């Protein structure tokens, strides 16, 4: 079990001044990823990871970066792929090479090769985010069964996401405010909740099998 989080916005200055917030968000993920922590802050994007190291301890560090065909891809990922060998073989046939044997690296190359079409190719449980540095786009995806959680909200003219609700609430731009719908979720459905509901005001959950492409601040969720 790992944890991911991040913020991507229109104005790089917003991202650059929020380092303390990112450290606080990362701290909320400590129980999910006690072994290693990583952070990527560049331009209008910040990606955060807390890792439970299971496979390829040296070469599986995140955020993981790949330069491929003129684009720079940065990945944070929580999950496990069950068809890693098959994906790796298909990617090697297309000219990709690998530094290690982690499924993280395979997923990153898969996105670089197939984009959003990599999601239906992945057999596993996952939630991940990929930042395309040159294109200025963020991609979020979640597995079909929704085993791995992923929440998001819009604030500061940006998108803020994380593996847990408390991760988002650690950001000062996300107030812990529960509206009428959220209160109904807690009182009538708790400890369960409606799929997609984040309980807190303006907080949503990416649905199982859904992905979202974000250019600047216009997220467009789609079902895979």
What kind of feature is each model-predicted range?
Residues 219-224:
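A short, hydrophobic C-terminal helix/tail in secreted or cell-surface proteins
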Residues 1-218:
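Cysteine-centered catalytic environments shared across enzyme families
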């Amino acid at each position: 079990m790992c944890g991911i989080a991040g913020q991507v916005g229109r104005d790089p200055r917003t991202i650059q001044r929020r380092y303390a917030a990112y450290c606080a968000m990362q701290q909320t993920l400590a129980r999910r990823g006690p072994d290693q922590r990583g952070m990527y802050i560049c331009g209008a994007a910040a990606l955060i990871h807390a890792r439970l190291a299971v496979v390829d301890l040296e070469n599986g560090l995140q955020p993981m970066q790949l330069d491929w065909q003129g684009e720079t891809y940065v990945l944070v990922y929580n999950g496990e792929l069950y068809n890693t060998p098959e994906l790796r073989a298909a990617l090697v046939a297309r000219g990709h090479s690998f530094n290690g044997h982690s499924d993280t690296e395979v997923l990153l190359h898969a996105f670089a090769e197939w984009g959003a079409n990599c999601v239906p190719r992945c057999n596993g449980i996952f939630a991940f985010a990929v930042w395309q540095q040159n294109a200025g786009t963020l991609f979020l995806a979640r597995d079909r069964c929704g085993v791995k959680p992923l929440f998001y909200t819009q604030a500061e003219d940006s998108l803020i996401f994380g593996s847990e609700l408390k991760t988002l609430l650690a950001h000062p731009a996300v107030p812990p405010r529960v509206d009428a719908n959220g209160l109904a979720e807690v009182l009538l459905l708790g400890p369960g909740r409606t799929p997609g509901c984040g309980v807190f005001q303006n907080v949503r959950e990416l649905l199982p099998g859904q992905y979202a492409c974000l250019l600047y601040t216009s997220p467009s969720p789609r079902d895979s």
